[in-house]
Amino acid sequence: MKERLHELEREALEKIEQAGDLKALNDVRVAYLGKKGPITEVLRGMGALPPEERPKIGALANEVREAIQKALEAKQTKLEEEEVERKLAAEAIDVTLPGRPVKLGNPHPLTRVIEEIEDLFIGMGYTVAEGPEVETDYYNFEALNLPKGHPARDMQDSFYITEEILLRTHTSPMQARTMEKHRGRGPVKIICPGKVYRRDTDDATHSHQFTQIEGLVVDRNIRMSDLKGTLREFARKLFGEGRDIRFRPSFFPFTEPSVEVDVSCFRCEGHGCSVCKGTGWIEILGAGMVHPNVLEMAGFDSKTYTGFAFGMGPERIAMLKYGIDDIRHFYQNDLRFLQQFLRV
């Protein structure tokens, strides 16, 4: 019996050493230490041995079992370490390779222009007023001297949600709302940036959604000369020193008198080029003195208070400033277009 136990120990230790992976090692464990293994059979056959041999054989069997168990544990630890090393080698990262450059974000050219315009007027003492894009018919039209039946209220020009609610067609409603909050007392000095909506067919110069920045000043003794001085300063800050502006008569229901405002061409210095179409001037915005009806509807005494208003499209200014020929580029999120402005 002793020889049998020693032989089983040698066989088991040899097979443990030969095991190449954890599965093979577990097979050895089951074969020698399992319920049907030879060590278990020896222990079960102890009853057939003479009484004086049982303690010795039992002790030897336990020693053999313990030796095999220790060998199994040592081999398992070794195999697990080798497996970890193989995985590390397979998943190794070559830290000497150059890293992938991080793609940095950059302000959108339109956002850049809007913020630049806001900063210019904030520097002149204006505050920024924002309001709802879904507006009532009253604030979008009627409070701005656009009564029922006015052509600008045509369903073909505006996105109506109900008969009395629509997507705002300009940011002028914020002028009426702000004047109402002042309860007939000046001064009022605001700019109103935001998205507006028109039922236009999208093309190179038109979009159903675009942005506007409108300005309003209301106080005692506001004159046309104040408007011109403000816009001249704006043009010089935005397009460069030496720029001049000119007023051309126009019509807007909410201002009287109304003007179109041109800036001297910043490409040809007024000599005539393709940008200014040979005239030396570029149209940039509309403006005028606030109509007395608009003042009265907002609660201001038009005999005591006067004011001026102006409105511009940041898309047009950005197109002029950066030489962009299609307004749709601003809204297509084409990186080939946007990456041109990384250092603008």
From Swiss-Prot:
Alphabetic keyword roster: Aminoacyl-tRNA synthetase, ATP-binding, Cytoplasm, Ligase, Magnesium, Metal-binding, Nucleotide-binding, Protein biosynthesis
Cofactor(s) it depends on: Mg(2+)
Gene encoding the protein: pheS
Gene Ontology BP terms: phenylalanyl-tRNA aminoacylation
Localization per record: Cytoplasm
Organism taxonomic ancestry: Bacteria, Bacillati, Bacillota, Bacilli, Bacillales
Protein name, entry field: Phenylalanine--tRNA ligase alpha subunit
PANTHER family, A to Z: PHENYLALANINE--TRNA LIGASE, MITOCHONDRIAL, PHENYLALANYL-TRNA SYNTHETASE
Assembly behavior: Tetramer of two alpha and two beta subunits.
Database matches in InterPro entries: aa-tRNA-synth_II, aa-tRNA-synth_II/BPL/LPL, Phe-tRNA-synth_IIc_asu, Phe-tRNA_ligase_II_N, Phe_tRNA_ligase_alpha1_bac, Phenylalanyl-tRNA_Synthase, tRNA-bd_arm
Annotated organism of origin: Geobacillus thermodenitrificans (strain NG80-2)
Gene Ontology MF terms in the entry: ATP binding; catalytic activity, acting on a protein; magnesium ion binding; phenylalanine-tRNA ligase activity; transferase activity; tRNA binding
Protein family per UniProt: Belongs to the class-II aminoacyl-tRNA synthetase family. Phe-tRNA synthetase alpha subunit type 1 subfamily.
